[in-house]
Amino acid sequence: MKLYIMRHGEANYPQGSYSDRERRLTTNGEHEVTTTAKWLIDKQPKVDCVYVSPYIRAQQTASILLSHLKTGQKQNCDDITPDGHAGSVVSWLAAEIQQHGYESVVLVSHMPLVSYLVHELDASVQPPIFPTAGIAVVDFSPETLRGKFQQLLIAERCAG
């Protein structure tokens, strides 16, 4: 099955009383997400489910993504925040995929978790540094909890 691990778009830094959870996408971040979403719909027009962090910038990213994709559903997941545990997320995600018979899934999250997830799935790959709105493409086997990293896409390359 295809697993797309996506980092949220560029976000403002927390100011004043705003917490990290409340950071919002910048105008550039919205553009980045739109660009990578268009690439994704060309490669994978139907996605079974989009799993998304509860943080505002990830929710905004998922909303833009979902406006371009044909998808069965969106599901919030409290475990895919920046300090989530990659091994636990992979086990949980594999169970979800097997339970529902999904063939393609997008996970919208944050650094450093997105980087650790790629390495957890494919230990032959060093944890990549994700740019904002970057998408890692992984062929994932939920039965073995392993995957094969295919590529890391960035908005600038998707636009060209």
What are the residue ranges of the model-derived segments?
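Active-site-proximal alpha-helix that buttresses catalytic centers in soluble enzyme cores
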Residues: K2-G84, V114, V125-A133
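Domain-level recognition of soluble alpha/beta enzyme cores
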Residues: D122-Q150, A155-A159
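Short phosphate-binding loop-to-helix
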Residues: T81-I97
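Short, well-ordered, mixed-charge alpha-helical segments that flank or form enzyme active sites
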Residues: S115-L117, C158-A159
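Generic beta-sheet signal
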Residues: L3, G101-S109, L113
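Glycine-rich phosphate-binding loop signature in dinucleotide/nucleotide-binding domains
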Residues: K43-K46, E96-E103
